[in-house]
């Protein structure tokens, strides 16, 4: 009996180690601007034989519809890896350094995910935060809000929220009132909340209603008039421009590749990130 128990314990320990070494891939949902930017910048998006772009994210990936869900999942699983807006980073997870060099080995320079490295272009996984609107549907109130976001005051909030600000534009406050309906992605949550609060404090007669969705829904809503302003955590697509949208970049953001704080890995190359998220690399031992 003791021999059987020892064998059983050995099998359990072996299985536990194997499971700990297996990579648990965590992804955002289709329609997410963060996912669209991530797969493009890391090479997870590839072209098929006909030249069509295909998202090659592994079918084994766990898919979540918001930034907080991805972050929580990774924080609770030592084998997990995911990606979130750099502006949403906190101490619950660890951001990996990323090497722009697509091949592993000597010469790879691992760069920390920071606003400074995004601004300099040294950090490879970065994307714009865009707003978009239909010019013929834009109210004076919504236009003033956009102008204020691009002002020194609005861009100071951008910087305070760990995003990369633009050169501020001149702003002349207007006497405005009314409601602004905005559709945004979850990645824009921390920033949008601060911008909304500050603008409403300056303009008590303005009510900003924010509907949380994803980037694609935000762009569709702006095009069909459901939203005054749509917000996307990616580039605005050609099809969205053809629908009559006018895009405005409000800042730049990095996409942090995150792991559990208990994970010993400190950095990955773009090639390794691609291979993990396409299912070519399945064990942490392959990148340690």
Q: What are the residue ranges of the model-derived segments?
A:
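Exported/periplasmic ABC-transporter solute-binding proteins
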Residues: 19-288
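Positively charged n-region of N-terminal signal peptides that target proteins for export
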Residues: 1-8
């Amino acid at each position: 009996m003791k021999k059987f128990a020892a064998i059983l314990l050995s099998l359990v320990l072996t299985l536990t180690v194997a499971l700990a070494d297996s990579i648990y891939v965590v992804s955002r949902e289709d329609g997410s601007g963060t996912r669209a930017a991530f797969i493009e910048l890391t090479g997870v998006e590839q072209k098929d034989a006909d030249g069509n772009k295909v998202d090659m994210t592994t079918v084994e990936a766990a898919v979540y519809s918001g930034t907080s869900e991805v972050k929580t999942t990774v924080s609770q699983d030592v084998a997990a890896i995911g990606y979130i807006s750099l502006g949403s980073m906190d101490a619950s997870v660890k951001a990996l350094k990323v090497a722009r060099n697509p091949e592993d080995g000597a010469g790879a320079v691992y760069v920390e995910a920071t606003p400074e490295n995004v601004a300099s272009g040294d950090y490879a996984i970065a994307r714009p935060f865009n707003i978009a609107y239909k010019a013929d549907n834009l109210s004076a109130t919504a236009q003033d809000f956009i102008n204020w976001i691009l002002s020194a005051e609005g861009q100071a909030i951008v910087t305070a929220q760990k995003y990369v600000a633009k050169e501020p534009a001149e702003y002349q406050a207007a006497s405005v009132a009314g409601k602004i309906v905005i559709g945004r992605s979850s990645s824009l949550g921390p920033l949008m909340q601060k911008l909304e609060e500050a603008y409403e404090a300056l303009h008590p007669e303005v009510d900003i209603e924010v509907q949380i969705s994803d980037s694609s829904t935000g762009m569709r809503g702006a095009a069909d008039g459901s939203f005054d302003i749509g917000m996307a955590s990616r580039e605005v697509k050609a099809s969205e421009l053809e629908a009559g949208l006018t895009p405005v970049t409000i800042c730049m953001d990095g996409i942090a590749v995150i792991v559990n704080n208990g994970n010993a890995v400190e950095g990955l190359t773009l090639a390794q990130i691609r291979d993990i998220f396409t299912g070519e690399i399945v064990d942490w031992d392959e990148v340690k």
